[in-house]
Structure formats: structure tokens, C-alpha cells
Swiss-Prot record:
Catalyzes the NADPH-dependent reduction of glutamyl-tRNA(Glu) to glutamate 1-semialdehyde (GSA). Pathway: Porphyrin-containing compound metabolism; protoporphyrin-IX biosynthesis; 5-aminolevulinate from L-glutamyl-tRNA(Glu): step 1/2. NCBIfam families: hemA (TIGR01035). It comes from the Archaea. GO terms for biological process: protoporphyrinogen IX biosynthetic process from glutamate. SUPFAM superfamilies: Glutamyl tRNA-reductase catalytic, N-terminal domain (SSF69742), Glutamyl tRNA-reductase dimerization domain (SSF69075), NAD(P)-binding Rossmann-fold domains (SSF51735). Substrate binds at T50, C51, N52, R53, S103, E108, D109, Q110, Q114. The record marks H93 as: Important for activity. Possesses an unusual extended V-shaped dimeric structure with each monomer consisting of three distinct domains arranged along a curved 'spinal' alpha-helix. The N-terminal catalytic domain specifically recognizes the glutamate moiety of the substrate. The second domain is the NADPH-binding domain, and the third C-terminal domain is responsible for dimerization. This is Glutamyl-tRNA reductase. GO terms for molecular function: glutamyl-tRNA reductase activity; NADP binding. The keyword Hydrolase does not apply.
Length: 454
């Protein structure tokens, strides 16, 4: 059976500090997914990391196996900052993340691009299977619907523009020189926001200088690019510094700022790019993403009505997603049932034809008649069980689905050889292939008794 149970875990800005999010995101998403796939009982994995969240999801044989695998996700983060999510909680949360309802900036667009890139990484390493592929694809669909059918992102500030607004409120921007460290999506947003102010000049520093040059050439402000090798020289010239790299190390140390004039620094990177002790330097003001909350709240009120619309949209799409999973599970059980019946049909038709051939040669039409009769019998006999399995899935009766899989799928639930038909069960017990413990609860009593006695 290809389906399983989804389990999730998250460390995000709602409950965790910047330090705790950083701790949970010490490993990149690719490494997290690859590691989770090595855990017992895990068949799929997905992870997404941004500056204000680190999350992981798995598909497991059962909830216990899923929680056990995810226990290693953020072992050093305090319990109150780590949120475990059940199957349905995980799916609903994925939809909320993609729509921007879980973002620090309500409805911001940046998360959708980050979500898509996380999916690309997961697909690239083969971490997604039918369960999570359906979940993340639905999340992207809902995220795009939310932005095209509601005003959830109208008037929304990005994290980058919120950082620029905070700098303006704190120390002013007029005539100042700004340094942006990082030329990725976040760095680009910061640079564009700075260019729309009265800043005098923007310097973009990046490990790959060509990317920094591309931003410097496109923003509407005097700007130039430097490599990270030249960072020390330009740090002392800038009075506003914003970091937004995924470099994974401190790029600004206390000694880099000591002796400089008034310097306002916002560290948007995850992991952080600014050494915490830098905040102790005189004339240095160091802020992180937590400081942006007051800015984001200013524009959030106007989007609350849209947020309610998106919530209703999520409810609708969430129900559709659950129904698709139910159909998938029922279809798999039905497929196994028909495959098992087809196996028996082929064997019995072959036996019947051999016996009839001994009585005289059969024509092709006679052979076709016998085979067609067998097909008709199977379809008629399995029509009622097929309906029962679909009804069971619709009613969340997974015991019936599991029983069907156990009876009809030889590989379901382990490597125990399964008998071809119920009457063979006692003989299988005599051979030692199965025991009473291997049987589903609703196997007929007279058969179960024979197995137990065997």
C-alpha cells in the first residue's frame, strides 16, 4: 500500500525565538529530508526553512514511527517552542503556510516562492511520494488561489520592506549609506525597498559578485556591488546594514563595528550573520526579525477580512484533499482485491480448460466463453465488496481497509506469505507460514480456530 500517516513538526516565530529557529535549522532542508528517509518506517519526507520557520514532515507506517523519526528534528530546542502535528494538522498547516496566514507578515508573497523551491529540492532527491506530493501540490494551489481570488496580499509589506521601514523609524534614512549583505530573494527585496527611499547609496555585498551586480544595476538608486572579501572595508562606511544570506556563519563581528559611527543593523539571515556580542558595541543598534512585529501589525488589520476568506478557502480545499486521500486508499484496496481475484481466476480457468481439453479439443470461441464467464463472475461477486470499501473510506473506517489489504495483498504488513484462498489458511498454519496473531479480526471463527489449533 502506497499510503501512510503524515506527521509533522515545526519551530516558528509564533512560539520560538530567533535563536531557537536558528538552532532547529542548523542542517539544511536537503540534509533533513535525506536523514529522515533513513529512519525506520519512513517512506516520504519534506522540509521547509525560512528566516522565521523550520519545519519537517514525514509519511510513516504509523503515527508512532512518524513521531519517533521527527524526535531528532530539533532535539536541543525547548519543548514549548516545538509543535508536533498530527496527520490532519500537518496537512492544514501546509495550506496555511503557503497562503501566508502563518507568515510574520500576513499574506506576504515571498513564502510561496520559498515553498516552491523546497518542493523542488524534495523532488530532486526523491523525498516526495504520493502522500506528500499531493499535500504540497495542494498547498501551492491554495496559495495561488488565495492571492488571485482575495486581497490577502494587497498592501502587505515584505519582510525586507518591513526591515527598511523599521530602520527609517529608528534612525532615519535620509542621506544615509546602506549596506545589504546577500543577493538572494531577501537581499533583493531589501535593496529594492531601500532604493525607494531617500537613501544616498546602496552597497550590495555577496559571495558571488555577479548576483550582487545584477541587483545594483536594476534598483532605482545609486548602487554598486562588492564581494564578501571586501566586506570589512565597506562595513565602516555604512550607517545602515542589513544581512540576508544563507551563509551559515557570522559575517559581522564586534571588532568590525568597534570604532565606527552610529550603525543600525538588522540581521534577517537564518542562521544569523551578526555575532550577538556586536550589540554590546557603543553606537551600534542590532535588531533581528523579532523586532519587525510592530511594523507588520500596522498593515495587518486591513487584511483581516481577506484572511477570513482565505480560511474558508483552506477549509474547502482541505476537505477535498482528505477526500482524495480516502479515494486513493480505497482504490488501492480495491485494486489489490481485483488483482487477487484475477490471480485465482487465471489459475482456475487454466485448470478447467486443461480438464475440458482432455475431453476433446476446444474452439477459440469456447475458450473465450469460459474466460468471459469467469470475468463476469468476478465482477458480480466483487461489486458489493467494492462499494463497501468505498463506503469504508468515506466513513474513515480504516480497519476495514486494512483488513482488505491484509487479505488481498501478499506483501501488505510484512513478508508473511498469504494463502491463495481462505480454505488454505489452516494448511498455511500447519506449514508455519502464519499464526493466529497474523489474522485480521474479522476472519471467520472456524478458520481462526483451525489456525490457533494448528
Amino acid at each position: 500500500m502506497n499510503t501512510g500517516v503524515i506527521c509533522g513538526v515545526r519551530v516558528s516565530h509564533n512560539r520560538a525565538s530567533v535563536e531557537e529557529i536558528e538552532l532547529a535549522g542548523e542542517r539544511d532542508s536537503r540534509t533533513i529530508m535525506e536523514t529522515l528517509l533513513t529512519r525506520d518506517g519512513i517512506t516520504e519526507s519534506f522540509a521547509i526553512q525560512t528566516c522565521n520557520r523550520s519545519e519537517a514532515y514525514v509519511v510513516a507506517d504509523g503515527a508512532v514511527a512518524g513521531r519517533r523519526a521527527l524526535a531528532s528534528f530539533a532535539p536541543d530546542v525547548r519543548d514549548g517552542a516545538v509543535v508536533d502535528m498530527s496527520h490532519e494538522e500537518s496537512l492544514r498547516h501546509l495550506l496555511r503556510v503557503a497562503t501566508g496566514l502563518e507568515s510574520l507578515v500576513l499574506g506576504e508573497d515571498q513564502i510561496l516562492g520559498q515553498f516552491k523551491r523546497a518542493i523542488e529540492v524534495a523532488r530532486g532527491i526523491g523525498a516526495l511520494g504520493p502522500m506528500l506530493e499531493a499535500g504540497v501540490t495542494k498547498a501551492i494551489h491554495v496559495g495561488e488561489r488565495a492571492r488571485s481570488e482575495t486581497s490577502i496580499n494587497e498592501g502587505a509589506v515584505s519582510i525586507g520592506s518591513a526591515a527598511v521601514r523599521l530602520a527609517g523609524q529608528s534612525v532615519g534614512l535620509n542621506g544615509r549609506k546602506a549596506l545589504v549583505i546577500g543577493a538572494g530573494e531577501m537581499g533583493s527585496l531589501v535593496a529594492e525597498s531601500l532604493a525607494s527611499t531617500n537613501i544616498s547609496e546602496v552597497v550590495i555585498a555577496n559571495r558571488t559578485i555577479e548576483n550582487a551586480e545584477s541587483i545594483a544595476e536594476t534598483i532605482n538608486s545609486p548602487a554598486y556591488a562588492v564581494s564578501l572579501d571586501s566586506l570589512t572595508e565597506v562595513i565602516t562606511e555604512a550607517s545602515i546594514i542589513m544581512t540576508a544570506t544563507g551563509y551559515g556563519k557570522y559575517l559581522i563581528e564586534p571588532t568590525d563595528i568597534d570604532g565606527a559611527g552610529e550603525t543600525f543593523i538588522i540581521d534577517l539571515a537564518q542562521p544569523r550573520n551578526v555575532h550577538p556580542a556586536t550589540a554590546d558595541i557603543e553606537n551600534a543598534i542590532v535588531q533581528d526579525i523579532d523586532a519587525l512585529e510592530s511594523i507588520t501589525k500596522e498593515t495587518e488589520a486591513s487584511r483581516q477580512a481577506a484572511a477570513r476568506e482565505v480560511d474558508a478557502m483552506i477549509d474547502e480545499e482541505f476537505d477535498r484533499l482528505l477526500e482524495s486521500y480516502k479515494r486513493q486508499r480505497a482504490d488501492e484496496a480495491i485494486s489489490e482485491m481485483y488483482e487477487a481475484a484475477e490471480h485465482v481466476k487465471r489459475r482456475e480457468v487454466e485448470t478447467a480448460l486443461e480438464k475440458l481439453e482432455k475431453q476433446g479439443t476446444l474452439t477459440d470461441n469456447q475458450r473465450e466463453t469460459i474466460s468471459s464467464m469467469a470475468d463476469t463472475l468476478i465482477n458480480q461477486l466483487l461489486a458489493a465488496p467494492t462499494k463497501s470499501l468505498r463506503d469504508a473510506a468515506a466513513e474513515d473506517d480504516w480497519t476495514t481497509i486494512q483488513t482488505a489489504m491484509t487479505l488481498f495483498d501478499p506483501n501488505f504488513g510484512g513478508d508473511t506469505p498469504q494463502p491463495d484462498r481462505p480454505d488454505d489458511i489452516p494448511r498455511a498454519a500447519e506449514r508455519g507460514d502464519i499464526s493466529g496473531d497474523d489474522l485480521p479480526d474479522d476472519v471467520p471463527n472456524h478458520i481462526a480456530e483451525k489456525v490457533s489449533d494448528g
